[in-house]
Design a protein with these regions (language model features):
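Polybasic/polar functional segments that serve as interface/processing modules
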Residues: 2-130
């Protein structure tokens, strides 16, 4: 159907879910945010703002949520550190390829946490309304 066709889409959204994310890093959240910024800066996307929230387990499970806002949309990462769950997603409009951004994130994450497993990667056409 037309709604699933990338050729009619004005945006592309890629989601990746991982398990086994247990990197041996002192500050995993800050490392991920720095990686996100680096990957975006090496792409054709335009970084507008970056932010991370670290969760210490007091009011929610330990982990972090990180976002890099793009002129074209966003790149996010969310982690439940005790469970080793990591979810990243990239949504872009225009000519920026979110697949290249996700691929670069995947390579670096795999290097930092060799036991990581990609459980799901899904690509969705967005703004398919003509």
């Amino acid at each position: 159907s037309r709604g699933n066709s990338m050729t009619n889409a004005h945006g592309v959204h890629i989601l990746a879910d991982y398990t086994g994310f247990f990197p041996k890093l002192d500050n995993t959240g800050e490392w991920i945010l720095s990686l996100m910024e680096k990957v975006v800066d090496e792409s054709t996307a335009n970084r507008v703002h970056s932010h991370i929230e670290e969760f210490d387990g007091t009011s929610s499970p330990p982990g972090f949520a990180a976002v890099v806002l793009l002129d074209e949309s966003h790149l996010t990462a969310h982690c439940y550190s005790e469970k080793g769950w990591l979810s990243i997603d990239c949504f872009t409009c225009g000519s920026t390829n979110p697949g290249a951004i996700i691929d670069a994130m995947h390579s670096a994450i795999q290097e930092a946490s060799p036991g990581i497993k990609l459980e799901k990667r899904k690509t969705e056409a967005r703004f398919t309304n003509g």
